[in-house]
Amino acid sequence: MTALAATSLAAGSSNAVPPSTPCALKRTDAHHSEGLDTWNAAYPRPDRRLDAVMIFLSFPDSVPQTTPTELTADHFPATSRFFERASYGKFTLRPHPLREWLPMPRASTAYAIKRDWNSARRSAYLRDALVASDPRVDFSRYDVVYFVADPDAPGVNSDATKVVNLEAPLRADGTDIRRVVTVFERHPPDRLVLAHETGHVFDLPDLYHRPADDKGDWDTYVGDWDLMGSQFGLAPDLFGWHKWKLGWLDPRQVSCVQAAGGEGTRMTLEPLGAGGAAVAGAAGGAEGAEAVESEFRGRRLGGGSGFPSGGLGSGELGSSELGSGGLGFGLGGGTKLAVVRTGRDSVIAFEARGPVGNDGAVCSQGVLVYRVRSETVSGGGPVEVLDAHPDTAACWEDSVYPPLADAPVGLGESFTVPGEGVRLEVEDRTDSGAWTVTISTG
């Protein structure tokens, strides 16, 4: 660690190099690599407005029981609001839904739709969908394509919802279509499922662990702490590392901790969800301050709040407190992410998580610690949350994985990363709700 830190200091000495650069892992050939030194140009980068077309497909063996308008409302504006909050208003996903069903030429059962889909049947489905929709859609106008199947058709399987990356792009309207989102969700669908799948369109990996028999725990890697782990998570905002990758954090908001030994590096971490659309409201006013599901309203936070007297966490959460996050967390321009380089393809990351923005239903708050590996493929554990309280669990009724629900390091606590010699001390809270910490290495 000492040699690595010294190298990082030398690399960061030039004024032309942002101070976060030494901690930026190199992008590798791993599928959805967590490296972020460069952007993979095969994917659209969500740092601006992107347009998405929603195409609704019916089948000759079923009469739709829902309308395209109803299915659109299943996913929007919730999906757009999630990304506007997560990106601090830097990214807008604008949906363009068709208003009618487009008939497919074959019965829904003919495509053998399932989670691990036969590639030949899947290709046939995509070809048929493109032929059915091309007369009605100018694909050159859109950055994202959603093919939404009739949820009541007998051959439709909700487990098959996924992003399909095409080695040989489909071609329509002079445009190469390199990936599509195939939506087979029920009505109503799983919460935030379209946001999860759309994350793959932006080169984000799956963070869940799929058991060999599909019967064990899927959420052992990151628990509730990122949408790409579970759309059901209590704190589904994207990790700060992902926000850095997607271009939503300015370089000055990422602190690369380079000093080894000594007294460590002291800094203030602002809650990840604070700022931009998270404070102003994704769509402005009450509409932009969409509250999380009512079942979480009034639930007391676990793990100790550590807020200043009278601040959030000193009592119950009301519905007005769970939405956009305009709760005195500050303006949102401070440091969001601290990183320690631990190897050629690995880092330890630190970020403050609390009940603001997309994390309104968080179980416990504090400074979350996690490991990132750039050479680990999607689904293989490229991110692992490190549990500061391995002997306890929390929020058994609501959490997707209670053992990690209380993972953050709380006020007055310290945590040493096993095997790395990296130590975090959470010392204080500011009046605006930020966390004062010291990170030591060596």
Put a short name on every predicted segment.
Residues 1-16:
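Secretory targeting and sorting signals
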Residues 15-187, 195, 213, 425:
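Zn2+-dependent metallopeptidase catalytic core
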Residues 25-26, 32-36, 167-180, 184, ...:
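Non-catalytic C-terminal accessory/binding modules of secreted extracellular proteins
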Residues 46, 118-122, 183-190, 220, ...:
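Extracytoplasmic/periplasmic, Sec-exported soluble proteins
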Residues 55-60, 148-152, 204-207, 230-233, ...:
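Active-site-proximal beta-strand/loop segments in catalytic clefts of secreted hydrolases
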Residues 61-66, 235-240, 358-360, 378:
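Short, solvent-exposed loop/turn elements at domain surfaces
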Residues 139, 152-306, 310, 323-357:
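Extracellular hydrolytic enzyme modules, especially secreted metalloproteases
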